[in-house]
């Protein structure tokens, strides 16, 4: 019983100064409540900081100590200081965390800016569009066909124009706006593709008739030259072998030699005019069938000339036999 009684007395002695200090603090607050001096605001501001993290009892004790600094015990002062230091440490930690978060955000933003400077996607997009448009322009204007013919020559044929009802759509509206040789929005040209488009194309003969006429005229000329040479040589030999014949027979032989020579150029002119008229009628459609026709006509003309020469030779021989 004595131990418990002593403990109760000790607790009452410890609580008594606290209650007294609380009463003193209330009295001082009532006194200062009516005052409007500048010190009243400072006292309230000085007490407000420690009272944030304290309970009701600890707040009353801190207020009492602030109002009456001469009262209280050293143990209570140390406890209050510990609590205040803990609160200040927590606030410092929160401020450090906020500063770290801000630094992280700034680092992330810097990375984004560096990536945007290193990879300019806008410029790449414009360059790619310019390249595609230049390719389409090159393909759109490349409207001719190259055909390899005999003799290692190239022939150029234009495509047939589309009918008036079906018009081709216009593809390169962007280049029409910018201009074919205009620079891009960033001051850069179209590059190698633009230079390739400006290179002149090799000149190629466009007349089909001239190219087809050369291989066709050669066999016809050879066939016409051979009978003329033979016909001119034979009468000359006969005239030299028979110098004693009469003048009339010589004149007949000369006339016979001149007639085939006159007829042969006429036949050559006719044979040359016929393919020329055919070429003028259809200069764009040269086929192997026309070559075959020309060969047949040349052969027919050569056969006719040979028959005429044979008939004339037979007549001359008959005349010579009669004269002898």
From Swiss-Prot:
Pfam family for this entry, one: CT47
Basic and acidic residues: compositionally biased ranges: 285-318
Region (Disordered) residue spans: 1-82, 88-107, 211-324
Domain of life: Eukaryota
InterPro entries: CT47
Composition bias type Acidic residues, residue spans: 246-258, 266-277
Family from the record: Belongs to the CT47 family.
Protein's name in the database: Cancer/testis antigen family 47 member C1
Native source species: Homo sapiens
């Amino acid at each position: 019983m004595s131990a418990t009684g002593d403990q109760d007395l000790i607790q009452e002695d410890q609580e008594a100064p606290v209650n007294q200090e609380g009463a003193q603090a209330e009295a001082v607050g009532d006194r200062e409540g009516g005052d409007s001096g500048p010190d009243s605001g400072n006292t309230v501001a000085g007490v407000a900081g420690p009272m944030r993290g304290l309970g009701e009892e600890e707040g009353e004790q801190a207020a009492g100590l602030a109002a009456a600094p001469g009262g209280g015990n050293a143990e209570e002062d140390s406890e209050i200081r510990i609590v205040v230091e803990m609160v200040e440490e927590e606030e410092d930690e929160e401020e450090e965390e906020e500063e770290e978060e801000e630094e992280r955000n700034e680092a992330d933003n810097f990375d984004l800016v560096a990536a945007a400077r290193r990879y300019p996607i806008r410029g790449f997009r414009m360059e790619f569009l310019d390249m595609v448009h230049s390719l389409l322009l090159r393909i759109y204007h490349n409207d001719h066909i190259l055909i390899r013919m005999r003799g290692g020559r190239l022939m150029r044929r234009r495509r047939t124009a589309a009918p008036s009802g079906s018009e081709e759509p216009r593809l390169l509206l962007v280049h029409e706006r910018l201009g074919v040789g205009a620079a891009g929005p960033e001051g850069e040209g179209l590059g190698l593709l633009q230079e390739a488009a400006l290179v002149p194309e090799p000149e190629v003969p466009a007349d089909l008739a001239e190219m087809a006429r050369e291989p066709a005229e050669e066999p016809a000329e050879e066939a016409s030259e051979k009978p003329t040479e033979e016909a001119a040589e034979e009468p000359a030999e006969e005239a030299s072998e028979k110098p004693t014949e009469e003048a009339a027979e010589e004149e007949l032989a000369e006339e016979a030699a001149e007639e085939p020579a006159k007829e042969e150029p006429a036949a050559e002119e006719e044979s040359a005019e016929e393919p020329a008229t055919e070429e003028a009628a259809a200069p764009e459609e040269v086929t192997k069938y026309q070559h075959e026709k020309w060969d047949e006509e040349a052969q027919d003309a050569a056969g006719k000339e040979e028959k005429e020469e044979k008939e004339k030779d037979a007549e001359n021989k008959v005349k010579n036999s009669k004269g002898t």
